[in-house]
């Protein structure tokens, strides 16, 4: 179907859940939730044309080098079953901000109190704003753990990177998870804003 006219009846279960404000138990399998390869393929085919409307992230030079024609949808359940469709299924990608909830979980497991990391509240500020402390609201911590300031605050719990990497491999079930050196070096060369955020957090204790 043409972009914009896809009825997405395959998402009926999800819509019903949202309408009824119910939650799908995490123990359910993909099959139990009615998620099939055919459904995911139809969603992918509908969404793919929109991918050309976006832009590569040029603020990190290495990310501007990825192939914009590659895309994929990958869904897994806690039973280890996985559905993967698209021409980018085998492409190794940088997880970028997807690491933020993992960082928060790691910090909590290491004994940091939520109140020591950040507030947990909505914010209208950009994800990488350097206005991390919101003094006009008399707030001395990041607004929530899923913006850059909150994630940097969570990363204060890391005193051994190998330990954090082992944690990530365990939590994701991916023993091959590794640092992408080219992306790391590219980020290190352009991360002045994040360094500024870190210094402001250090200055406030």
Question: What are these regions, as identified by a protein language model?
Answer:
Residues 48-85:
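A short, well-structured edge-of-sheet supersecondary motif
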Residues 13-16, 86-88:
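Short beta->alpha transition motifs characteristic of CBS
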Residues 80, 94-114:
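Active-site SXXK
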Residues 23-52, 109-205:
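Active-site-adjacent helix/loop patches that line small-molecule binding or acyl-intermediate pockets
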Residues 81-90, 131-137:
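Glycine/charged-rich beta-loop-alpha catalytic/anionic-binding loops adjacent to active sites
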Residues 1-15:
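Acidic Ca2+-chelating loop motifs
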Residues 70, 92-101, 144-145:
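Short, conserved micro-motifs enriched in small and acidic residues
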């Amino acid at each position: 179907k043409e972009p914009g006219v896809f009825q997405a009846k395959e998402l009926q279960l999800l819509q019903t859940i949202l309408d009824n404000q119910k939650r799908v138990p995490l123990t359910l399998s993909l099959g139990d939730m009615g998620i099939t390869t055919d459904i995911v393929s139809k969603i992918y085919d509908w969404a793919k044309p929109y991918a050309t409307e976006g832009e590569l992230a040029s603020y990190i030079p290495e990310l501007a080098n990825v192939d914009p024609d590659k895309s994929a949808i990958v869904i897994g359940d806690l039973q280890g079953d996985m559905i993967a469709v698209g021409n980018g299924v085998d492409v190794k990608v940088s997880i970028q901000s997807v690491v933020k909830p993992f960082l928060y979980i790691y910090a909590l497991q290491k004994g940091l109190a939520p109140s020591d990391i950040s507030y947990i509240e909505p914010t209208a500020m950009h994800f990488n704003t350097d206005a991390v402390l919101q003094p006009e609201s008399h707030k001395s911590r990041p607004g929530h753990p899923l913006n850059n300031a909150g994630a940097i605050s969570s990363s204060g719990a890391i005193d051994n990177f190998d330990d954090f990497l082992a944690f990530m491999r365990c939590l994701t079930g991916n023993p091959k998870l590794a640092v992408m050196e080219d992306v790391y070096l590219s980020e290190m060369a352009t991360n002045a804003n994040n360094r500024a955020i870190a210094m402001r957090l250090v200055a406030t204790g």
